[in-house]
Regions:
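Short amphipathic alpha-helical segments that mediate assembly, nucleic-acid/protein binding
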Residues: 32, 111, 124-127, 146, ...
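Residue-level marker of intrinsically disordered, low-complexity segments enriched
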Residues: 8-10, 16, 132, 147, ...
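N-terminal accessory interaction module
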Residues: 3-97
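N-terminal acidic leader/helix
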Residues: 103-121
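Surface-exposed polar/charged interaction patches
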Residues: 42, 97, 116, 120-124, ...
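Amphipathic, non-membrane alpha-helical rod segments
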Residues: 57-67, 124-144
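Repeat-associated, polar segments at repeat-unit boundaries in modular proteins
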Residues: 70-106, 141-164
Length: 164
């Protein structure tokens, strides 16, 4: 039944992201609670606070107390799109990964992040914006992963078109 596949209603909650630096990091615009939840495999309610410092992000959550690089966060829509400098920062960060096979690619959870954002997109135009964003950073994914992401994008787009 198609109606049972509707994404949940938008939930408005107070942000737990606090900017502690007077000089924001260029990648600070991509820090989101959704990304933190996927990064650490926790729920929104488990996050106590996220502090954005000059060079790192401090995440304090239930069972988590960790410093995270800004380059670990995927881009998002609704803010300035990623620039060439952002691409360089991401690639430099990925080269530091211990897994040889993934040194040229984004972390695996980025795929989950984009699929989740496709699913939560309230309108076709927002979904299209997410699709364009993934298209600009397709270098970050293997061919198989990119095919999976765009396959899900196509299914989600079709569902939203049928609903709208």
């Amino acid at each position: 039944m198609v109606s049972s596949l509707n994404p949940k209603a938008i939930v408005i909650r107070s942000s737990k992201i606090v900017h502690k630096s007077l000089t924001p990091h260029p990648l600070a615009r991509f820090v989101t609670e959704e990304a933190i939840c996927l990064m650490f495999r926790i729920g929104f309610d488990d996050i106590y606070t996220v502090e954005c410092w000059r060079y790192v992000v401090y995440v304090h959550a239930q069972g988590v107390s960790s410093f995270v690089s800004y380059a670990d966060f995927p881009p998002t829509v609704g803010v300035q799109p990623p620039t060439r400098a952002d691409f360089i920062k991401w690639r430099r960060r990925w080269r530091k990964q211990h897994n040889q096979a993934h040194r040229k690619q984004a972390p695996e959870w980025w795929e989950e992040y984009f699929i989740s954002e496709f699913w939560q997109a309230p309108t076709e135009s927002v979904l299209h914006s997410w699709g364009e964003l993934v298209g600009t950073i397709k270098f970050a994914f293997s061919e198989d992963t990119l095919a999976e992401i765009f396959n899900f994008y196509g299914h989600t787009s079709l569902l939203k078109h049928l609903q709208g």
